Every structure is written in structure tokens, then in C-alpha cells.
Amino acid sequence: MLKSTDLKNESEMSRVKVLSEALPYIQKFTGRKIVVKYGGAAMRDSNVKDQVMRDIVLLSCVGIRPIVVHGGGPEINSWLGKLGIEPQFKDGLRVTDASTMEVVEMVLVGKVNKEIVSLINQAGGCAVGLCGKDASLIQARPEGIEGIGFVGEVSNVKIDILQSLVDNGYIPVVSSVATDEQGQAYNLNADTVAGEIAAAMEAEKLILLTDTAGILEDYHNPDSLIVKLDIQEARELIEKGIVSGGMIPKVNCCVRSLAQGVRAAHILDGRVPHVLLQEILTDTGVGSMIVA
């Protein structure tokens, strides 16, 4: 006869087993920096959002040093609509004129960033919100594409403020807005910002949370997930058109960060519950991992 106490004991043993399996990974990554680009459905679904924040806090509590980088495209579109500004895109990039740039900065720095900071702190962490302007963290330059306005790319990363924060147990949360040498604000791709910060901070891992299982050989077949590949294989997938559309800048930023010393880059499905913990603290791992 199976009693309820037996089920309870089995459940408790299962939890203990999970914790035991996590131990070698906690030991391996304690003190190491991991940069997480937070975006996609993980930002839109309140349940997933809470899980991601709690997972980030857990990683911090076991001695791993997470740095969060975020965008906020849907939120920007929503506020542009409220203000009667029609969102415009060119070759997948947001056309960012002066009025749009004001909204981008207001939403990313003043709203989305502070919401993430608040959620992490509510979950028991100690987060500090930043943008590229703070302590000259990121210097931007124009993207160089005609007709897209104040869309920029990363020119330089000055890590002093991030290093100070992580060394003292804080969780930095960085929004993808920065200025050039003249003080002009630019809208930056959050994936690219995450990759450049990971490289500058000599991070152990760069993790991009997306709305897909990872890199797929066949976009229409989730079972065609490529679990592990190296830089050369990643470049070949782009050349062959297997990696296309919005996945190209994600793979490119992973490749660039690896070339600058990041140990591993991961593209994960942010919709999967506790995907960060599965990737970092278990034997199985999830999503696609790119290595040098």
C-alpha cells in the first residue's frame, strides 16, 4: 500500500537529488561571471518573468555573478502607439529619429530597467539598474546605415562600474542605451551589448534568452535543434542560410564574444521554466551551445 507519506518522501528525495547534482556545477562556476540577455517571452509572461528573476537571484546566492542585459522592443512599440508615433523598421532595425529616441530611452531606462531591478530585489536579490551612460559604461557610435537615425553599435565598454558591483555582491541590470563622444544618445541592439559586456568582463558564459528552442537546422521542426557547435560551424550555418533573419545577429554576437575570450555562448528558449538553472546547474543542459 502506497501512503501519502511515501509520496511526500519521494518528492523530497527528488529535490535532494537535484540539489546534489547541482553541487559540482556550483563549485565550478562560483565566482564566475555569467551575462544573461533577458528578452522575448520571458519579459512578457508574468509567470516566466518571476521564474527568471528568482533563478537569477538563486545563481547569485550560490556565488555565481550574474549580469543582466535587456532590451524591450514590445514595450517601446506600446508607448510609441500611446504617443501617436508609428514604429518604423528598416532591414530589421528600428528607425530611431529624435522623438523615437526619447521614447526608447524613457521606456528602457526609466521603466523596463527599473521593473527588472524591482523584481530581482523582491525575489531577495540586490540589483542595481544601469544604462550605457552610467559611469561611461558603454560608448556608442553610429551603426553606419543610412536612414535609420540614432541606431548605434558598441564602440567601447568601460567595465569599472560593473566590476565594482559584482565584486560587492550586486546584480547589475543594464539597458541598451548609450551615448557617443559628443553625448548623443543611441539605441543599441541588446544582444550585441550583452556580447560585448561578456567579452569585456571575461565572462564564463553568455546566455541569450529567446523565443525559440535554439539554433534549428529546420526552422519549422523543433526536433532539429543543434545542441552544440563551434565558431566555424556557426559561420557556415549563416552562409548556407540555415541561420537567418533575427537569429543572425544573435549568432554573430555569440561568435564575436567567443572570439574575445568568453568560454561558451548559449541560445536558450526563455519560455521554458527555470531554463537558466537547467543550463547552468544540471548535467543535461538545454538549447544550443556555441564554443570556440
Swiss-Prot record:
Record-listed substrate binding positions: 72-73, 94, 187
Family, per entry: Belongs to the acetylglutamate kinase family. ArgB subfamily.
Pathway named in the protein's UniProt entry: Amino-acid biosynthesis; L-arginine biosynthesis; N(2)-acetyl-L-ornithine from L-glutamate: step 2/4
Catalytic activity: N-acetyl-L-glutamate + ATP = N-acetyl-L-glutamyl 5-phosphate + ADP
Entry function: Catalyzes the ATP-dependent phosphorylation of N-acetyl-L-glutamate.
GO BP, sorted A to Z: arginine biosynthetic process via ornithine; L-arginine biosynthetic process
GO cellular component: cytoplasm
Listed EC numbers: 2.7.2.8
Protein name: Acetylglutamate kinase
Subcellular location: Cytoplasm
Enzymatic class: transferase
Organism: Trichodesmium erythraeum (strain IMS101)
Residues carrying the site annotation Transition state stabilizer: 37, 250
Domain of life: Bacteria
GO molecular function terms attached to this record: acetylglutamate kinase activity; ATP binding
Principal location listed in the UniProt entry: cytoplasm
Keyword terms of this UniProt record: Amino-acid biosynthesis, Arginine biosynthesis, ATP-binding, Cytoplasm, Kinase, Nucleotide-binding, Transferase
